[in-house]
Amino acid sequence: MSTPAFSLRNPENHARCAKPLRKRKLSPPQIDTPRSFSPSRQKRAKTTKILGQSLPVHRIIETLDRNALQSLLQQVAAANPQVAQSIVDLAPKPDTKDALAVMRAKFDAITAHLPYKCSAESDYSYTRVKPYLCEFLSTLSDFILNMLPPLEVDLQPACTILDAITEMIHKLPNFSNSEFQYTRAMAYDQLSTSWQILLDAADERLLVRVEAEMGLSRRLQKHNELSGGKLTQAVESAGRGQSPLLGGLITVDYSSFRH
């Protein structure tokens, strides 16, 4: 039996035919990198997602000035009647000083917008200040209604405010415009009615006290003169504070009295 030409047992043939093996070099991509350092295998830390949000209402209010806050409240109240009623229910009652400050500011806006180069009583002057005059009269109406019975039970603050309102009507520029003359006459009529309602509803003892502290009858007599007699009925209503209870406050001279 012949031996195969390429028998592994023939070292001479094996040495002649076999090619020497070369040691393979590992290329860089084939080099194993520890998994802990592999960028593709690293786990990114989870971060909490934070979204922007609007300021709370109380923070928004803190940033607003007086005018901006007033404008905002008026817009909200106009759009939401229930909110408007909540404001009425929750807002503190304005005191006499604050109420008068608002009305005087409205009055000052009229005089501040009078033109310089023409008569303050001209039609042009009236047309220019008419929007401010209407706002002033509207403001007076709101405050007058707020201090009449049964809302107002304290007579003296109400009389103080109504006295100041009457004084401001006297001081309005006497525009020659017929529309203004009619408006002013109506204002005096409404003031007279308001005085009567306020004084007729007052207890006589309270009226006596206000008369003693304010000299109400004297003030109304002066207002009546300046209005051209349009407050006569108000003067008569105030007269209840002089008789009969006021008689106890009058000093009587008994020096000539004979027993």
UniProtKB/Swiss-Prot annotation:
Iron-sulfur listed as a keyword: no
Compartment(s) where it occurs, according to its Swiss-Prot or TrEMBL record: Cytoplasm; Nucleus
InterPro entries linked to this entry: Cut8/Sts1_fam, Cut8/Sts1_sf
Coiled coil: none
Residues spanning the membrane: none
A single MF term (Gene Ontology): proteasome binding
GO CC annotations, alphabetized: cytoplasm; nuclear membrane
Region of interest called Disordered, as start-end residue ranges on this chain: 1-46
Main subcellular location: cytoplasm
Signal sequence annotation: none
Pfam families, per database record: Cut8 (PF08559)
GO terms, biological process: nuclear protein quality control by the ubiquitin-proteasome system; proteasome localization; protein transport
Sequence ranges of Basic residues compositional bias: 16-26
UniProt keywords, alphabetically: Cytoplasm, Nucleus, Protein transport, Transport
Family classification: Belongs to the cut8/STS1 family.
Functional description taken from the UniProt entry: Involved in ubiquitin-mediated protein degradation. Regulatory factor in the ubiquitin/proteasome pathway that controls the turnover of proteasome substrates. Targets proteasomes to the nucleus and facilitates the degradation of nuclear proteins.
Subunit architecture: Binds the proteasome.
Name the record gives this protein: Tethering factor for nuclear proteasome STS1
